Amino acid sequence: MREFGSEHSTITLPDGYFENLNNFGRKITYLRSGREALLYVACNCKLDERGVILLPSYCCWSMSAPFAKSGWNISYYKLKEDLTIDEEYLIKLLNNCKVDAILTMNFFGSASTDNAIRLVKEFWSNIIVIEDFSHCTFSIKKIFNPAIDYYVSSIRKSIGVCDGAVVLSKEVMNPAYMGKEIKDFSDRRAIAQKMKSQYTYTKDQDIKKSFLSEIKFCEGLIDEFDLPRPISVKARNMLHLVNGGNIAFARRENMKHLISLLGGKVKMLPGLLLLGRFLQWVSADSRCCLP
């Protein structure tokens, strides 16, 4: 049953979350998507044609494709069942090939990368460390590690902006690798998101088909990897309206709700514990810093 009446929850005011990223002493660059942010970093830090980067064995295409597109030679390091880095295997890789960079990820805010990064920097301090913090976009204060050279997050994975990603870098990045804004992407994404909002109330299947079609079209645009593009003016203005604390709370509560619905209905198989570990992390507030 829908609620009607004069009593409403409070209007949420912005808390300046993205403005406060400047407090970490990094150069801040906003782009339109996470994969293009990774491409921008990949182009900025690639040294030569023989450059080797290590990626986690558990990662999606949008994490590996930017480095393949920019000509990096890719090797993969192992993860343990709790999604932390297998440090013994990592050391073997470091000893067996000349590694120029490594991409890490703090999965769900519970798979700390601090010790592995310390090992990498002790092995050779010039190895570039890139961390994808998309799972911890609103918890950077909790996980921040000064040894990391580039922090990258897909903002649009966490909040309702039409496009958006952010890079926190130690050095100023080369704008020559950046293209111009393409409004078609952000405009069509904004239309799709508006239709999705309408669908949440109407449950109209035609509206659902329309917004899914628009989103699929837009994803095809960024899959082309022609050039990294900046965040749209529309999305950048949206960031000023964000309350990061409320979003982090809502995401965590949603995950708790998911756990309660699953409630023993999902059978875990030995050696395939990713979902099980994820549910454990979310249920332990002190350990998990989603999103």
What do these predicted ranges mean?
Residues 137-145:
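Glycine-rich, charge-decorated loop segments at or immediately adjacent to ligand/cofactor-binding or catalytic sites
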Residues 1-49, 97, 226, 234, ...:
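Conserved PLP-binding active-site segment in aminotransferase class I/II-type PLP enzymes
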Residues 71-76, 127, 147-152, 264-268, ...:
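Active-site regions of enzymes building and remodeling cell-envelope glycoconjugates
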Residues 35-37, 59-61, 82, 107-110, ...:
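Short, solvent-exposed loop/turn segments at secondary-structure junctions
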Residues 12-27, 36, 42-124, 130, ...:
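PLP-dependent aminotransferase-like
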Residues 22-29, 59, 103, 179-291:
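PLP-dependent aminotransferase class I/II
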Residues 148-199:
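Active-site PLP attachment segment
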